[in-house]
């Protein structure tokens, strides 16, 4: 492909001048290269998500865990145990880990989580292993412990953990056999609804007053009430 050009000839002259048209597309090279079918069939994309811990994050966490004397041959199991525990208790920054898992050489889950938070969020780490925990829970028919407290129906109970969307994230680590079954549309809807409720309640507990004058606050410490914060969802 050649660069489009504008050929003009001066009046009273036999000499032609060639000028490049402003804004013309340069030759098919560099950043102006146009992909063809071969590219799409052969190119390899590295899947990454800012919602999921990266492989670089895992490498850093692994080194910290080594310093804490977590055995290399059970390190993966220690991670899976921690994430399975988070499916029960939550993966927010405020969540308190309970006890010590059987694969961490006596290092508590709280210390494992603290090491993770030096590199990424606990939820990002949990989403990395969400497919592993999903299969684990289904295999043992053991849903997240707090599914009833969160208001989930029995048929949606396996979706009752706050990093559920990591189960289908392509950046997560999936077992060799794949998912035992994909999450159903009803489970995904239930998980999204639970997340919405948590966010709404959290916002209702925050102070959104622009003034501390009693005429504005009416003596309330928090801002918007739960009833005011809830947005009515359209009927199905």
From Swiss-Prot:
GO terms for molecular function: structural molecule activity. It comes from the Viruses. Disulfide bonds: none annotated. Its main location: virion. One of its GO terms (cellular component) is ribonucleoprotein complex. Required for genome encapsidation. Forms ribonucleoprotein complexes along with TGB1 helicase and viral RNA. This is Coat protein. It comes from Potato virus X (strain Xc).
